């Protein structure tokens, strides 16, 4: 489809100010170190406001009290969000205990937020605690480097507790890819870890002096689970196994979900299949994809800078041929693979290594001690006795991994007493939201705070129509940037204004089809009225095993998105 619309390999024109900022930053140093010592403001100023993102942080403020503080002639209550680099979501219990302590003692909100990028975030870090958080992470072998802005972000890997050997191999590749694509600048170590400046010239052989044109996301996925939502990502390595052993990857490039309301030059896009590669070429191919996007990505318009737009501009075959040239390989034909689901298997699963794995449902990934549900304390107690590790899933849940039979009852007791194993409906298990208000500066409508009561209402509709044992993949994102991955849901709500959302329908359960907007700028009662009617029809008219999204397409309720670059907005 893309070959009909070839365009220039490099977009000429005035570069965005972000490109100026990166070029002048002295390899991401800026004046962050000096800004840290400025006690007159709780935030970072000028270019540093954006540069700290390369160091894994976003400057935010509490939007619930923004107007009140403005009336009092006070600056916004600035605080940082920090996102950890955690390839594949694996974290040791020692590391967990350290982040639990920091969250409780040094953040405004006191919580740990699991994200659908398979890592954790701290919200509400005051400026005085910014350096200590990086030093705490370093002390337990973690960092926040390259988890935001124009770099390869946290690398995802399917959380598959059953196929323990295959997961271990895939996870190792996720770590290798993450390390290979990290920036080489010593700015992070100098600013946060007080490491000495080395008298050598900085070089960025892969990312370049101005880094990537836009954010870049990578996954390693183990079929038949598509829990990491590969089509939301720029570069995806689909594991191909023979006799339970990893032999190579299918490569898919150019997925991405972010759009802008009303801007038809923006669109969500599923990733394109490039071909199969043996394991030994993995890092060379990863580097070739990244450097091709580095050189060809649009640096004149950040809203059109991601890999998906580059593919559509130059053509899939042209981009693929350049990757082959740079990597020195020829892709083999795609090997067969299929996806059957995206959800986590909540509860106990026994692995082929005879260890047990307990997947805990964490609503919206928010770990905090609630009345009668001390989730944070419960997980801390488990971390103190568990000999295995924890694994954060791309569905914002947590796996207590590698539990021997002898420890199973002890861990289950703590989990149950802490409310970590409370029964939830299949619908709630398969619903997700981004953070949105009060901390996200881009939020247009509620998401995390909206979802629990919204799902109460959806559960009532499911019961009304006799489908309580079923689920619809349902997601809410507070703005069209799409962190909640609503643009791969069967039912996606995209925030438009306070209390109002665009309702998207027609995605599928396995995450391989983009949903289309069904109704625009509507309220929760209007959303529920529409879904009441549609769930009722699905319950009565569906075919055997037919998911809600597939039904809405087959029944003619919504047209499927076949070529999102050209028909998403039709």
Swiss-Prot record:
Reactions the enzyme catalyzes: hydrogen sulfide + 3 NADP(+) + 3 H2O = sulfite + 3 NADPH + 4 H(+)
Cofactor: siroheme; [4Fe-4S] cluster
UniProt pathway: Sulfur metabolism; hydrogen sulfide biosynthesis; hydrogen sulfide from sulfite (NADPH route): step 1/1
Binding-site residues for siroheme, renumbered to this chain: 483
Binding site for [4Fe-4S] cluster: 434, 440, 479, 483
UniProt keyword Metal-binding, yes or no: yes
UniProt xrefs under Pfam families: NIR_SIR, NIR_SIR_ferr
Organism superkingdom: Bacteria
Principal EC category: oxidoreductase
EC number(s) stated in the UniProt entry for this protein: 1.8.1.2
Gene3D superfamilies referenced in this protein's UniProt entry, alphabetically: Sulfite Reductase Hemoprotein, domain 1
Keywords: 4Fe-4S, Amino-acid biosynthesis, Cysteine biosynthesis, Heme, Iron, Iron-sulfur, Metal-binding, NADP, Oxidoreductase
SUPFAM superfamilies the record matches: Nitrite and sulphite reductase 4Fe-4S domain-like, Nitrite/Sulfite reductase N-terminal domain-like
Iron-sulfur as UniProt keyword: yes
GO molecular function, one term: heme binding
Primary role: Component of the sulfite reductase complex that catalyzes the 6-electron reduction of sulfite to sulfide. This is one of several activities required for the biosynthesis of L-cysteine from sulfate.
PANTHER family: SULFITE REDUCTASE [NADPH] SUBUNIT BETA (PTHR11493:SF47), SULFITE REDUCTASE [NADPH] SUBUNIT BETA-RELATED (PTHR11493)
NCBIfam families in the record: CysI, PRK13504.1
The protein's assembly and partners: Alpha(8)-beta(8). The alpha component is a flavoprotein, the beta component is a hemoprotein.
Protein name: Sulfite reductase [NADPH] hemoprotein beta-component
């Amino acid at each position: 489809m893309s070959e009909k619309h070839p365009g220039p390999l490099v977009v000429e024109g005035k570069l965005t100010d972000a490109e100026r900022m990166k070029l002048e930053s002295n390899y991401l140093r800026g004046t962050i170190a000096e800004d840290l010592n400025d006690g007159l403001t709780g935030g970072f100023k000028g270019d540093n406001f954006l540069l700290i993102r390369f160091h894994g942080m976003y400057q935010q403020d509490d939007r619930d009290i923004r107007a009140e503080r403005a009336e009092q002639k006070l600056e916004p209550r600035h605080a940082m969000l920090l996102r950890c680099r955690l390839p594949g979501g694996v974290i040791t219990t020692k590391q967990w205990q350290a982040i639990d302590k920091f969250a409780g003692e040094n953040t405004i909100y006191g919580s740990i937020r699991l994200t659908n990028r398979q890592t954790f975030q701290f919200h509400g870090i005051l400026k005085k605690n910014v350096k200590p958080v990086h030093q705490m992470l370093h002390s337990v072998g973690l960092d926040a480097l390259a988890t935001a802005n124009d770099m390869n972000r946290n690398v995802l890997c399917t959380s598959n507790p059953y196929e323990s050997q295959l997961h271990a191999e895939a996870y190792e590749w996720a770590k290798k890819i993450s390390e290979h694509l990290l920036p080489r600048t010593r700015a992070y170590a100098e600013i946060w870890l007080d490491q000495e400046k080395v008298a050598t010239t900085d070089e960025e052989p892969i990312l370049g002096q101005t880094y990537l044109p836009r954010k870049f996301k990578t996954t390693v996925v183990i079929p038949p689970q598509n829990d990491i939502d590969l089509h939301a990502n720029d570069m995806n390595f689909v594991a191909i196994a023979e006799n339970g052993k990893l032999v190579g990857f299918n490569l898919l490039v150019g997925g991405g979900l972010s759009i802008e309301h009303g801007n038809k030059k923006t669109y969500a896009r599923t990733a394109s299949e490039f071909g199969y590669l043996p394991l030994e070429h993995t890092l060379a191919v990863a580097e070739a994809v990244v450097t091709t996007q580095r050189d060809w990505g649009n640096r004149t318009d950040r809203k059109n800078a991601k890999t998906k737009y580059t593919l559509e501009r130059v053509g899939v075959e042209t981009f693929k041929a350049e990757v082959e040239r740079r990597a020195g390989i020829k892709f083999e034909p795609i090997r067969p693979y299929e996806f059957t689901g995206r959800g986590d298997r909540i509860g106990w699963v026994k692995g082929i290594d005879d260890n047990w794995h307990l997947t805990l449902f964490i609503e919206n990934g928010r770990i905090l001690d609630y009345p009668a549900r001390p989730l944070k304390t419960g997980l801390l107690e488990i971390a103190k006795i568990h000999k295995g590790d924890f694994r954060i899933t791309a569905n914002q849940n947590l796996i207590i991994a590698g539990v021997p039979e002898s420890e199973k009852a002890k861990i289950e007791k703590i989990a149950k007493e802490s409310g970590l194993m409370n029964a939830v409906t299949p619908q709630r298990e398969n619903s997700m939201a981004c953070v949105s208000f009060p901390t996200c500066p881009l939020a247009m409508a509620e998401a995390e705070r909206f979802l629990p009561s919204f799902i109460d209402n959806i559960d009532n509709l499911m019961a009304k129509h006799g489908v309580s044992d079923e689920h619809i993949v349902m997601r809410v994102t507070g703005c069209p940037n799409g962190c909640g991955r609503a643009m791969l849901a069967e039912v996606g709500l995209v925030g438009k204004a306070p209390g109002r959302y665009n309702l998207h329908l027609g995605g599928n359960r396995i995450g391989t089809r983009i949903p289309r907007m069904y109704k625009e700028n509507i309220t929760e009662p209007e959303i529920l009225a529409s879904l009441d009617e549609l769930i009722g029809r699905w319950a009565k008219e569906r075919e055997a095993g037919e998911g809600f999204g597939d039904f809405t397409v087959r029944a003619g309720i919504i047209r499927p998105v076949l070529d999102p670059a050209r028909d998403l907005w039709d």
